[in-house]
């Protein structure tokens, strides 16, 4: 009886084990087949990632081509320095972007830099001002050379020094009002745009994008800083306050100072601040690095320029682990570019480790669709008198 019971129990156990094992094997087989079913969706995920990149460019950088390699590089770099888990992470209080102005944020061929255009207007086309014969002749030769696309005439003084002298005695408010009046003039060589509107729309969107990613934005330009502040206030003032604008410096004096050294003079409450008529420093090349260090104490996280005048700023950025980009003046359809010059500049940038931005290929528009280049290579006498 006991023997029969044992046999029965063993038989029952074997039956149960067989059912369980069969069920387990079936489960294992089903699990093993599962990856085959998810292989195709994995490929779909990869294509979604590529689409998301183009979406990021169009959403984050307005007016940039969706296939722009430069835009892709900028976005990837910004991601790396803003991600706390990245080895490239830069804390918000150290996250800075430095921009040149002329040819980087703003056009420089109207037919020349904005501050030079302002100087020429003052010397040649301002009926309220009578310049010296020497300066009038210099200005006329310079304007003629610019319109003819010829080298600038030689001069004992830089155009910046001349500009400082012809605005001597202006108060800051008078100077800013004069600048703003000129900003309303039509930009030479274009229709549908004033001097105050001559900013590169893709670069303005880049400034906004960097600000949204908690970069502190600076302008570091060779232009005199009061001109810079007034010119950029309407378009860039939302993201770049006056104290973040670095430029060349014109000397100042108090109304009653009369040549007394500033270290030995104290002004009264009713004295006005006046421009004294001299260029103190020109913010170019290595001077840009000195200005960045002295005025901000910052090491650039990212910087943007467009000429050899920005090479030192770019090198300083790279030396501190940042990235530097240079614009190429390679668009001859929408702007007054120079293909040969752009190609040579691109080669030099590659040697120095700078990435380049093609105005022709990377920008969907430059000044806006309502702005057209007039294709003017020279100017007639009626236009010059305007």
Task: Identify the meaning behind each predicted range.
Residues 68, 169, 286:
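Electropositive phosphate-/nucleotide-binding environments in soluble metabolic enzymes
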Residues 12, 21-30, 37-101, 109-110, ...:
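Non-catalytic pre-domain segments flanking phosphatase-related domains
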Residues 53-65, 79, 94, 177-218, ...:
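C-terminal cap/substrate-recognition subdomain and adjoining C-terminal extension
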Residues 7, 89-91, 238:
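Generic structural signal for beta-strand residues in well-ordered domains
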Residues 110-113, 117-197, 201, 205:
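A metal-dependent, Asp-based hydrolase signature
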Residues 2-24:
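Sec-dependent N-terminal signal peptides of Gram-positive bacterial secreted proteins and lipoproteins
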